[in-house]
Swiss-Prot record:
Residue ranges, annotated region (Disordered): 61-83
Its job: Probable ion channel inhibitor.
GO cellular component terms attached to this protein's record: extracellular region
The keyword Methyltransferase is assigned to this record: no
Name of the featured protein: U11-theraphotoxin-Hhn1a
Signal peptide: 1-21
Keywords: Disulfide bond, Ion channel impairing toxin, Knottin, Secreted, Signal, Toxin
InterPro entries: Toxin_22 (IPR012627)
Top-rank taxon, per record: Eukaryota
Organism: Cyriopagopus hainanus (Chinese bird spider)
Disulfide bonds: 75-90, 82-95, 89-110
Pro-peptide positions on chain: 22-74
């Protein structure tokens, strides 16, 4: 009976001591995993930031192209209203007050010289 008790006690002591070692190993593993997770999150965050910056650069580039294409024409054609203080009539045209048929518009138009 004593041998059974001694054997049981020996097995119990080994189990407890190995269990503590496993507990320490588990704690170390968990720390490593959380550190790896943090580094992965940092990597993912940096990657997302780079993609957003590229997207922003493309959008700004498209805006600048759009503004270049949508600029106003350089001159105004014949029969088109113009501003007497800032005439933008094309060459060969003059910004004049309309005669007869356009009197009621109270505006200036580009006419041939």
């Amino acid at each position: 009976m004593n041998t059974v008790r001694v054997t049981f006690l020996l097995v119990f002591v080994l189990a407890v001591s190995l269990g503590r070692a496993d507990k320490e190993e588990n704690r170390m593993e968990m720390q490593e995993k959380t550190e790896q997770g943090k580094s992965y999150l940092d990597f993912a965050e940096n990657l997302l930031l780079q993609k957003l910056e590229e997207l922003e650069a493309k959008l700004l580039e498209e805006d600048s192209e759009e503004s270049r294409n949508s600029r106003q024409k350089r001159c105004i054609g014949e029969g088109v209203p113009c501003d007497e203080n800032d005439p933008r009539c094309c060459s060969g045209l003059v910004c004049l007050k309309p005669t007869l048929h356009g009197i009621w518009y109270k505006s200036y138009y580009c006419y041939k010289k």
